[in-house]
Amino acid sequence: MKGTFPVNKFRELETPFYYYDVNVLRETLSCINKEAGKYNNFCVHYAVKANANHKVLTIIRESGLGADCVSGGEIRAAIKAGFPTNKIVYAGVGKTDWEINLGLDYDIFCFNVESVPELEIINELAAAKGKTARVAFRINPNVGAHTHANITTGLAENKFGISMEDMDKVIDMTGTLPHVKFVGLHFHIGSQILDMGDFVALCNRVNELQEKLYARQIIVEHINVGGGLGIDYAHPNRQAIPNFTEYFATYHKHLKLRPQQTLHFELGRAVVGQCGSLISKVIYVKQGTNKQFAILDAGMTDLIRPALYQAYHKIENITSEEPMETYDVVGPICESSDVFGKAIDLNKAHRGDLFALRSAGAYGEIMASAYNCRALPKGYTSEELV
C-alpha cells in the first residue's frame, strides 16, 4: 500500500524536496494531547532537533507542546515559532557561554545540566545578570536501549549526563552556588525505542534515585524522562501514529512520582517522523552487471540516515503502477554509501518518475548538508500545495 500524495502539484516543484502532511501531524499531536492529558501532571515538550522547519514548529506550538532545545539556534527557532519561553528546556553537553546567556535572557523553564564545569559556568553567568537559573541534572542511568549503537545515550560509556555515582556530589555543590536552583532530574536513554521494557527499566532506575534523594529529604519539582519512542518505518501507511497510549501508561504505572511532582517528556521522532516524506525524481535507470539502479536526484546530503545509521526508509514509486521490478535505489553523491536501499521491489521505474522516501519527517531535512556544493532541499506542507 502506497501513501497518498498530490502528484500533480509535485510535478510543478523542483526536486528533491520534503513534503509534510499536516493532517498526519495534527492527528499525531491530538493523540499526544489526549493520551498525556489523562494524567494531570504530564508535560510534553517537542524535541526541536528532530525537525526545525518553521511551519512544522508553528503547528506543534499551536498544539500546546513545549520545546526541548539542544542549542542556542534551536532556542531561537522555538521562540520565532512562538513557543512560550517558560515551556522551553535546554540540554546539551557543550553549551557555550552565548547559548547559556540566551537561555538566561529569556528565562527559560530549565537548563538540563550535564557536567560540574557546566553547572559552575551557569552559576557564574547567571550571577553576572543578577539572575537565578533553574537547573535539572541530567543523570546517566546506565540503562541500555534496544536501538542502534549511535543513538543510545544512557550508558555509562556515552558522553551524556552525570553518573549516578556523582549525583550526590553535584547536588551538594548547588548549596554553594547561589545563582542556580536545583529543580529536577533529567534522563534520556536513546532514540527509536520500540520495546516498552526499556522505559520500564528507566522508571526503575529513576525510582531508585528518588529514594536516595528522599532519604536526604530532597524532593525535586519535576522529573524529565526525555523521549525515545520510535515509529514504524516499515509500515508508515498502516501505523502512522505511534502507540502513545501504551507509552504514557507505562510511565504512569511504573514511575513513582511524589505528590506535586510533574513528569516531563521530550518527544521528537514520534511527533514528526511519519508526517514527512522526501520526494525525489529518477534521473536515470541504469542496468548494471547483476542489478538495476534507480538513480535519484536526492542523495545522502538530503537524507543521511541510511548512510549514517543503515536506517530503513520505505521507498515508493508514486508515479508508476507498472509491474514490480527490483532496484538498488541510489543518489548522485560521490560516496559509495550514498544508497537509500538495495534490492527494493518497486513499480517499474522510468526517467522522471517521482519516488517518495517515507517516514522522513524526523532527522531528515534538519540533517541535510551542502556536501558536493549541493543546494539544501526545500520543505513544503500539504496546506501549501492544495
Residue map of PLM features:
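Short acidic, glycine/serine/threonine-rich loops at helix termini
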Residues: L57, K80, I100-D105, I122-L125, ...
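Hydrophobic "anchor" residues on beta-strands that sit immediately upstream
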Residues: H45, R134, H222, T262, ...
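A charged N-terminal "starter" segment
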Residues: M1-A133, D172, T176-K181, E211-I218, ...
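Short, glycine-/Ser/Thr-/acidic-enriched flexible segments
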Residues: V24, N51, E74, K95, ...
